[in-house]
Amino acid sequence: MKVSIIVPVYNEEKTICKVLSRLQKLGKQDFSYEIIVVDDGSTDTSVLEIKKSKLQIPKLKVVSHRKNKGKGMAVRTGIKHATGDYVVIQDADLEYDPQDIPRLVKALGVAGVDVVYGTRLDRLPNLHRDERVPLFLLHFLGNRFLSLVTSILYGQWLTDMETCYKLFPRKALTNIRLEAKGFEFEPEITAKLLKKGSHIYEIPIKTNPRGYDDGKKLDTTRDGVRALWTLIKYRIYD
């Protein structure tokens, strides 16, 4: 089995090399894997950092957008270049630990499972600084609400619909037309996978939450409203 690890990047000059290094350190696994980096029109030195990493990881696939198009578009571009049996998304910051990827793959062995999500929301987030508490609690509660809406609308219980760590079969996208350009990619692909009959299995993962001072780009209120509308829209339409 081969897994395509897609890494969308937008202005992550401080972390992208570390993330790619951690992915490389996955080493030999029970599955083969490829790493596909999609630079989404970064305006900082992310491209230079990616080039440095490619010197250390010759098989690294790099695709670039001339202009910023959004995370959803970056992931869709990565999927077009993927050759694996399964696809998993890895954010370019240090919030998600690549060491959890083998655990996601292992979970495919559970009977009837074809899609695996890594859930952060079976517990309160790991908060490091007092001033972050209101922000992360808002984000946590917003995600729980959206996950509850997903569960009600699509008939399968999920605790973390918005998680970055989504492992799904590439062939499952053959009959799915993805349209999202931004962060609404998360609810769109979840909605469409569930409507096609996929069973999503969740496993707990550890994360290191970051704030806007660390480069976080998600707007909890704006993107939360868009996610809610996306879930409702695809419940009604294909």
Predicted regions and their residues:
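Hydrophobic helical membrane-anchoring modules
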Residues: M1-V3, R129, L153-Q156, L178-D238
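Active-site beta-to-alpha loop of glycosyltransferases that engages the nucleotide-sugar donor
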Residues: V7-S21, G41
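Acidic donor-diphosphate engagement hotspot in glycosyltransferases and nucleotidyltransferases
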Residues: V19, S46, V75, Q99-I101, ...
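Short, acidic, metal-binding catalytic loop of nucleotide-sugar glycosyltransferases
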Residues: S21-S32
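Conserved donor nucleotide-binding strand/loop of the catalytic core
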Residues: Y33-I36, V47-H81
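A conserved acidic beta->alpha catalytic loop
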Residues: D39-L48, L94
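Acceptor/aglycone-binding surface of glycosyltransferases and processive sugar-polymer synthases
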Residues: H65-H81, Y86, Q99-F183, P209-L218
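Short beta-strand-to-loop acidic/aromatic patch adjacent to the donor-nucleotide binding site
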Residues: D85-D93
